Amino acid sequence: MKKIKRDDEVIVTTGKDKDKRGKVLKVLDDGRVLVSGINMMKKHTKPNPMLGTPGGIVEKEAPIQASNVAIFNPQTGKADRVGFQIKEDGTKVRIFKSTNEAVDNQ
């Protein structure tokens, strides 16, 4: 089970986008995450008349290392660490380390 999943709200802890918040769009296999509005890059595209796409400069998100983001805890309003807890019925759930509340209930 991964500590950061798709649709989690995260805060960037280091880099040019430090202290910005965003929602995780995708978790890549190599330990990187794609976060909405974070680590924006400009891609120069050629026009393609076959597809009807115009050329120009397109701004899109680039992946960021998962170690450079922390999950956002809405109860404290700060970044938090994620831990795991096994319930009585044997299911494994993610919890916030500071409050011991389940992440998936938010």
From Swiss-Prot:
Gene3D superfamilies of this UniProt entry? 2.30.30.30
Is the keyword RNA-binding assigned to this protein? yes
- Which is one GO molecular function term here? rRNA binding
Q: Which residues cross the membrane?
A: none
Please provide one cellular component term from the Gene Ontology annotations of this protein.
ribonucleoprotein complex
Q: Which NCBIfam families match?
A: rplX_bact
Q: What does this protein do?
A: One of two assembly initiator proteins, it binds directly to the 5'-end of the 23S rRNA, where it nucleates assembly of the 50S subunit. One of the proteins that surrounds the polypeptide exit tunnel on the outside of the subunit.
Supply the HAMAP family for this chain: Ribosomal_uL24_B
* Name under which the protein is recorded: Large ribosomal subunit protein uL24
Organism of provenance: Marinobacter nauticus (strain ATCC 700491 / DSM 11845 / VT8) (Marinobacter aquaeolei)
Top-down, what is the taxonomic lineage of the species of origin? Bacteria, Pseudomonadati, Pseudomonadota, Gammaproteobacteria, Pseudomonadales
